[in-house]
């Protein structure tokens, strides 16, 4: 933008100067009519041209300053938007915002927080309905072999390769508080899965389906855990590049070797697609509650298998840590 302003400022004096030189140099009769001879008119022309050059230089300097100011403001704006995660808002604050205020801010991928409340589970014995359960991951680690040779497999930090669409939301189900203080939650409905891909330090990408389908968690509010269903990352109708699928496509796309020895197991993995589900485990902990508004927040940690590419690859363990928010009615 600064270059365009400078170009405009340079062109304007040039256009202004052109007719001035044309009129002053038109003919000697016009000079004599005003009482000037040719030499005086020439000096006058040079004087006007020098003034125009000064004006052009000032316009150029002003354009440079304007361009620098615009670039500085752009850097400030981009720096403000790149500072990191936005401020965490309460449920009411999020509901009060318009679509355009939320769009592109990162708020849609965040779980709400609680203002005030108590740092304990302050709900009495009884049966409730847990609604608007939100699970926001803050860390993805994958159990894999280290870069160093002979190093045992361990959970390694990863780089997120997908957009900020990994938060689960609007999950609901029955929630019960027993007389002995234990709680029980059963997941029934909601946006309970999200496809995520992360990258290991060595460059390997690990896709998985972050989910809590059919979760049944029991225990004390400080730590209640349970198992859940992890569906196949790909559906049975998905076709691989050779047209093979679980419920559609070719049965075999690679011919069996003569004699049927040596590669049977590898060929079976590629030809026969496995879309069976697996199991994950999650532990939730309550860190703060607000009974007057029915809100509760906490942290969670889950371990689940990654994608198997329809049975052709061994799954990796994925550890997901984050925060959660819910409302009890």
Swiss-Prot record:
Pfam (any one): MSP
Any one GO biological process: photosystem II stabilization
This one is known as Oxygen-evolving enhancer protein 1, chloroplastic
Query: What does UniProt give as the signal peptide span?
Result: none
Q: Which UniProt keywords apply?
A: Chloroplast, Manganese, Membrane, Photosynthesis, Photosystem II, Plastid, Thylakoid, Transit peptide
Tell where it localizes. Plastid, Chloroplast thylakoid membrane
List, alphabetically, the InterPro entries matched. OMP/PagP_b-brl (IPR011250), PsbO (IPR002628)
Originating organism: Fritillaria agrestis
Task: Name the family.
Answer: Belongs to the PsbO family.
Keyword Ribonucleoprotein assigned: no
GO cellular component term of the entry, any? chloroplast thylakoid membrane
Molecular function (GO) terms for this protein are: oxygen evolving activity
The record describes the protein's role as: Stabilizes the manganese cluster which is the primary site of water splitting.
What Gene3D superfamilies has UniProt attached to this entry? Answer: photosynthetic oxygen evolving center domain, Photosystem II, cytochrome c-550 precursor
Keyword Kinase tagged: no
Q: What positions does the transit peptide occupy in this chain?
A: 1-82
């Amino acid at each position: 933008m600064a270059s365009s302003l400078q170009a405009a400022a340079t062109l304007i004096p040039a256009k202004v100067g052109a007719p001035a030189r044309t009129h002053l140099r038109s003919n000697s009769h016009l000079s004599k009519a005003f009482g000037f001879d040719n030499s005086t008119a020439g000096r006058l022309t040079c004087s006007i041209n020098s003034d125009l050059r000064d004006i052009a230089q000032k316009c150029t300097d002003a354009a440079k300053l304007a361009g620098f100011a615009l670039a500085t403001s752009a850097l400030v704006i981009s720096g403000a938007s790149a500072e990191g995660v936005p401020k965490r808002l309460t449920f009411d604050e999020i509901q009060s915002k318009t679509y355009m205020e939320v769009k592109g801010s990162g708020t849609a991928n965040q779980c709400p927080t609680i203002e005030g409340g108590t740092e304990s589970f302050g709900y009495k014995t009884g049966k409730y309905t847990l609604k608007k359960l939100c699970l926001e991951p803050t860390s993805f680690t994958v159990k894999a072999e280290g870069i160093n040779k002979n190093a045992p497999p361990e959970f390694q930090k990863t780089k997120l390769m997908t957009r900020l669409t990994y938060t689960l939301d609007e999950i609901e189900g029955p929630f019960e508080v027993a007389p002995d203080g234990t709680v029980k939650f059963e997941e029934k409905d909601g946006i309970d899965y999200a496809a995520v891909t992360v990258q290991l330090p060595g460059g390997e990408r690990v896709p998985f389906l972050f989910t809590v389908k059919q979760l049944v968690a029991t225990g004390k509010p400080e730590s209640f855990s349970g198992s859940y269903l992890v569906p196949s990352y790909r559906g049975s109708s998905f076709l691989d590049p050779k047209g093979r699928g679980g419920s559609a496509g070719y049965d075999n796309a690679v011919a069996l070797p003569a004699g049927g020895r040596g590669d049977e197991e590898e060929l079976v993995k590629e030809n026969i697609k496995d879309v069976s589900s697996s199991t994950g485990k999650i532990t939730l902990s309550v860190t703060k509650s607000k009974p007057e508004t029915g809100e509760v927040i906490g942290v969670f940690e889950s371990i689940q298998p990654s994608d198997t590419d329809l049975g052709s690859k061994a799954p990796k363990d994925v550890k997901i840590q984050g925060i959660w928010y819910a409302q009890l009615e």
